[in-house]
């Protein structure tokens, strides 16, 4: 077996092992919260940095288009990472730590949901957003590493993966967000 094949096998084996550690009860709670938000016409907001920002954006596409198109009940979801003009305006004029919390102030109302995604669980802008959301009556969901940093501690619901390997972590985040989306896309009772 060549080195590349060995790497591929090991990567797949570790990904498989990590998927077995995901918490079905916690993911089911997140599904329930999303369903309640849709039924009450509440906003679901998502944020992250770097690869986590792209995961937040992809989740919005799957929910807003995939789980809403052609259905009577529609989700209202927005990624706080998608307007580069807004993000850079706050980063330049206020601070990078405030790029999400300042946007949240426009959307915060009790019953809305904030989904925050962070590999380290310690990104200052993510933590400020969660703290503000908690104080404003939003439900908060954190996707992070098993060690979780502060995000794991301050999120009302934590969906964690026990690894610090960013590739495996992001693979698992994508899988969890796809579960959260596809349960609505493929199941008409939802």
Q: Each predicted region: which residue ranges?
A:
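Generic N-terminal amphipathic, Lys/Arg-enriched alpha-helix
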Residues: 1-21
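Short, glycine/polar-rich helix-capping loops at beta-to-alpha or helix-loop-helix junctions
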Residues: 143-155
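Short glycine/serine/threonine-rich phosphate/pyrophosphate-binding segments
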Residues: 52-57, 122-129, 151
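Short beta->alpha connector loops at strand-helix junctions that form conserved
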Residues: 81, 118, 144, 159-167
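A charged, well-structured terminal subsegment
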Residues: 106, 167-190
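A short, well-structured juxtamembrane/interface segment
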Residues: 22-40
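Glycine-rich, small/polar surface segments that engage phosphate groups of diverse ligands
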Residues: 36-108
């Amino acid at each position: 077996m060549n080195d590349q094949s060995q790497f591929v096998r090991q990567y797949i084996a570790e990904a498989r092992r990590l998927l077995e550690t995901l918490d079905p009860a916690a993911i089911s709670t997140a599904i329930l919260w999303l369903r309640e938000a849709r039924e009450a016409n509440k906003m679901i907001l998502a944020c992250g940095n770097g690869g986590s920002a792209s995961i937040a954006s992809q989740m919005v596409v799957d929910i807003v288009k995939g789980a809403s198109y052609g259905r009577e009940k529609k989700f209202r979801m927005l990624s706080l990472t998608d307007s580069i003009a807004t993000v850079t305006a706050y980063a330049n004029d206020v601070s990078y730590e405030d790029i999400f919390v300042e946007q949240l102030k426009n959307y915060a109302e009790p019953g809305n949901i904030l989904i925050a995604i962070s590999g380290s669980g310690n990104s200052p802008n993510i933590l400020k957003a969660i703290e503000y959301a908690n104080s404003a009556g939003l439900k908060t969901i954190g996707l992070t590493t098993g060690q979780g940093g502060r995000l794991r501690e301050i999120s009302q619901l934590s969906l964690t993966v026990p690894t610090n390997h960013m590739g495996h972590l992001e693979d698992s985040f994508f899988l969890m967000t796809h579960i959260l989306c596809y349960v609505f896309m493929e199941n008409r009772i939802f």
